[in-house]
């Protein structure tokens, strides 16, 4: 807590990228709902794969650096932070879990929410489940199947809805581009890129069991289910080299 009484969180540098350090999920929620007022800005989950994308693509780096709240979603990133900053009290906050926690808090407080992305049927199921489970005040939605020409009208819909949380499930970097552009018209909300979270929430895609997650082996579980991911996993060897050579 800072001198004003607002919940604070330390910042850490990893390969030049500034990450926010949350101790756990309650800390993350209290930080985002500071003094009962939701912070404005963009939430971006950082894992090893995204760290590589930041290194290799200047446009992605600019997008990610511009986001106000970059947090450690991947266990590899958490371990790197703890190695570089031995006193850091930082834990993994999985993006899918943070989204659910935000939705639950939004339902309890009546915070207006706008959902973007996903297949039409998945989005409809997501809305229905959010309303049934937590009475979330969903003030608008749009599936991921819209044309570039429809973007501006969608930005205006989001602004006119008065949403205070906007979650975007379009995959990276498309969702980061969308959030950046929408915020230029309507900055008065918390934006969150959520990738495939709607699919997980509705049961169309299954996450690794908690046992695998706790061991930091969620990536291996996904590899067993999808052997075609092997090329993506080989790319992550470069991140391991940074970690073990101290080039963080």
From Swiss-Prot:
Query: Which GO BP terms sit in this record?
Result: enterobacterial common antigen biosynthetic process
Record carries keyword Repressor: no
Query: For this protein, what is the EC number?
Result: 2.4.1.180
CDD domains, A to Z: Glyco_transf_WecG_TagA
Q: Which Pfam families does the UniProt entry name for this protein?
A: Glyco_tran_WecG
| GO MF assignments | lipopolysaccharide N-acetylmannosaminouronosyltransferase activity
Per the record, the pathway is: Bacterial outer membrane biogenesis; enterobacterial common antigen biosynthesis
* Keyword Membrane included in the entry's annotation: no
Q: Which reaction does it catalyse?
A: UDP-N-acetyl-alpha-D-mannosaminouronate + N-acetyl-alpha-D-glucosaminyl-di-trans,octa-cis-undecaprenyl diphosphate = beta-D-ManNAcA-(1->4)-alpha-D-GlcNAc-di-trans,octa-cis-undecaprenyl diphosphate + UDP + H(+)
Could you list this entry's UniProt keywords, alphabetically sorted.
Glycosyltransferase, Transferase
Q: What does this protein do, in the record's words? A: Catalyzes the synthesis of Und-PP-GlcNAc-ManNAcA (Lipid II), the second lipid-linked intermediate involved in enterobacterial common antigen (ECA) synthesis.
What protein family does this chain belong to?
Answer: Belongs to the glycosyltransferase 26 family.
| PANTHER family (UniProt xref) | PTHR34136, UDP-N-ACETYL-D-MANNOSAMINURONIC ACID TRANSFERASE
What's the protein name?
A: UDP-N-acetyl-D-mannosaminuronic acid transferase
Organism of derivation: Klebsiella pneumoniae subsp. pneumoniae (strain ATCC 700721 / MGH 78578)
User: What gene name does this entry carry?
Assistant: wecG
């Amino acid at each position: 807590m800072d001198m004003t009484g607002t919940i604070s969180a330390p910042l850490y540098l990893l390969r030049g990228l500034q990450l926010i350090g949350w101790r756990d999920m309650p800390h993350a929620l209290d930080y985002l709902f500071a003094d009962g007022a939701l912070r404005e800005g963009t939430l971006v989950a950082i894992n090893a794969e995204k760290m590589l994308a930041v290194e290799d693509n200047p446009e992605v780096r600019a997008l990610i650096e511009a986001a106000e709240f970059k947090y450690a979603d991947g266990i590899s990133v958490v371990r790197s932070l703890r190695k570089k900053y031995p006193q850091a009290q930082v834990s993994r906050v999985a993006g899918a879990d943070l989204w659910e926690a935000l939705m639950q808090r939004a339902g309890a407080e009546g915070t207006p929410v706008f959902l973007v992305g996903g297949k039409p049927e998945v989005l409809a199921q997501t809305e229905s489940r959010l309303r049934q489970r937590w009475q979330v005040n969903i003030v608008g939605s749009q599936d991921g199947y819209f044309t570039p020409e429809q973007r501006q009208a969608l930005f205006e819909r989001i602004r006119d809805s008065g949403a205070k949380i906007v979650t975007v499930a379009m995959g990276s970097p498309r969702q980061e581009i969308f959030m950046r552009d929408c915020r230029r018209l309507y900055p008065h909300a918390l934006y969150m890129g959520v990738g495939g979270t709607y699919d997980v929430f509705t049961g169309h895609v299954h996450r690794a069991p908690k046992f695998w997650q706790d061991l930091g082996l969620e990536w291996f579980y996904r590899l067993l289910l999808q052997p075609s991911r092997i090329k993506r996993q080989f790319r992550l060897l470069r991140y391991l080299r940074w970690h073990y050579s101290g080039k963080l």
